[in-house]
């Protein structure tokens, strides 16, 4: 990775346009003012500056992890047996994630059903032990005969917590204009969960922790942190939604601190949400619970990586636009990412991509974009090298695939075609 990264206005705006940089959006303020003002940040960092996100502490922080494999990395010479390694590693990673425990599948209710373009779309809801009820779309092709392979389709983050499942589904009803443009920008205009269902899958798209039906409501938090913002009215104007999303981006800092203080982590909580969704999917009468997979872009790619690494039920997984290394985040890219990524002490145990390999030899695919400014291209390639190395060492090199596509952060039609082919290879054989 280049050690002398350049921060400049063009680079920063490209981050912000992806909707990840949250607290660094120009003009973004929070109760009491935001000390991390984006405009000031840009003015203080010219195109010729050689800086990092934590100043004079950067060199020291970068040296802590170095290039050596983590203590539980399968790259270590001491690990040779895949089963023994992952049994030990999973116990430790579960401990670090500190996920809320949900002991049984909650009661699931069907609250709506539509048919659109050859796909049945049922709206489901269930109540977890924490937070508001979860809503999800369950999609199946019409005239199903026999049990189908099931895929957990994981929506992205996109700095848009007002929406979740609607980002990748079209249920045949009028779509909000923001969701139409979202699909056009990131998914070639496609509701890819629908496209996958058409190809013979049962697809579940759940709102995860803090998104759409699971979002934090302003009425439920103290006025001192509302920053004059109110919950979105039924008219759902773009202005109201964007205002809520700016507030929610800043609220991530509070949420992360509170979760750490409670003894859990943000990845641990969304993983618990998604594991329950996987249980719901596997319990449906239309689904073959022995053929389950997952796929997602960006924040959905992170979710795919986590549940694909931590849950043995996932037989095939695709991570799109969310693969790099911890080293990439230390100095240059942590500010472009959500708190959903970070687990204290995990980098000591293994590198970021190795989480995705925790269920080896289960097949895993990574899709990257060469102009994705959320990560350093060199570190995306290094993550690919790490995953190739561990799958090769385990004796299953054919069970891992990585592809690089031209262009910015996206999961476009060409990438969808490749992802769907990968899922078909492993879930329909």
Where are the regions a protein language model picked out?
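Alpha/beta-hydrolase fold nucleophile elbow
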Residues: 287-296
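C-terminal segment of N-terminal export signals and the immediately downstream linker at the start
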Residues: 5, 27-54
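Cap/lid segment of the alpha/beta-hydrolase catalytic domain
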Residues: 154-272, 330-331
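N-terminal secretory signal peptides and thylakoid transit peptides that target proteins
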Residues: 2-20
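Non-catalytic accessory segments flanking enzyme active sites
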Residues: 61-139
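C-terminal catalytic histidine-bearing segment of alpha/beta-hydrolase fold enzymes
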Residues: 339, 385-386, 390-429
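Mobile cap/lid helix-loop segments that gate and shape the active-site cleft of serine hydrolases
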Residues: 249-264, 268-277, 315-356, 374-384, ...
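Proline/glycine-enriched tight loop/beta-turn segments at coil->beta junctions
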Residues: 131-133, 142-150, 157
């Amino acid at each position: 990775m280049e050690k002398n990264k350049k921060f400049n206005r063009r680079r920063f705006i490209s981050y912000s346009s992806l909707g990840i940089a949250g607290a660094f959006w120009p003009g973004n303020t929070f109760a009491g003012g935001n000390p991390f003002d984006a405009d000031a940040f840009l003015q203080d960092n010219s195109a010729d500056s050689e800086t990092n996100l934590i100043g004079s502490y950067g060199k020291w922080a970068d040296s802590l992890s170095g290039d050596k494999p983590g203590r539980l990395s399968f790259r270590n010479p001491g690990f040779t047996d895949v089963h023994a390694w992952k049994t030990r590693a999973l116990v430790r990673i579960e401990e670090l994630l500190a996920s809320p425990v949900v002991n049984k599948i909650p009661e699931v209710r069907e609250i709506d059903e539509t048919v659109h373009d050859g796909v049945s779309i049922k709206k489901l809801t269930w109540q977890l032990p924490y937070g508001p009820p979860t809503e999800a779309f369950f999609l199946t092709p019409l005239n199903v005969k026999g049990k189908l392979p099931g895929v957990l389709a994981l929506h992205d983050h996109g700095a848009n917590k007002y929406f979740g499942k609607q980002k990748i589904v079209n249920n045949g009803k009028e779509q909000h204009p923001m969701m139409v443009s979202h699909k056009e920008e990131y998914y070639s205009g496609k509701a890819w969960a629908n496209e996958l269902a058409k190809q013979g899958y049962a697809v579940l798209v759940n709102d995860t922790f803090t998104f759409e039906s699971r979002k934090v409501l302003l009425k439920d938090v103290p006025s001192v942190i509302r920053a004059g913002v109110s919950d979105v009215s039924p008219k759902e104007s773009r202005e109201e939604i964007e205002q809520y999303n700016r507030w929610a981006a800043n609220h991530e800092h509070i949420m992360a601190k509170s979760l750490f203080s409670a003894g859990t982590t943000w990845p641990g909580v969304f993983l618990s949400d998604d594991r329950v969704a996987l249980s719901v999917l596997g319990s449906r009468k239309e689904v073959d619970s022995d053929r389950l997979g997952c796929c997602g872009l960006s924040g959905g790619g992170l979710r795919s990586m986590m549940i694909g690494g931590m849950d043995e039920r996932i037989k095939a997984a695709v991570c799109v636009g969310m693969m790099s290394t911890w080293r990439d985040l230390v100095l240059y890219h942590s500010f472009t990412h959500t708190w959903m990524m970070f687990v204290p002490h995990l980098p000591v145990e293994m590198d970021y991509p190795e989480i995705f390999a925790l269920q080896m030899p289960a097949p895993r695919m990574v899709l990257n974009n060469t102009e994705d400014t959320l990560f350093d291209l060199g570190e995306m390639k290094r993550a690919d090298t790490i995953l190739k190395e561990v799958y090769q060492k385990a004796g299953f090199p054919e069970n891992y695939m990585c592809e690089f596509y031209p262009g910015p952060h996206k999961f476009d039609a060409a990438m969808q075609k490749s992802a769907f082919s990968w899922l078909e290879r492993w879930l329909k054989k």
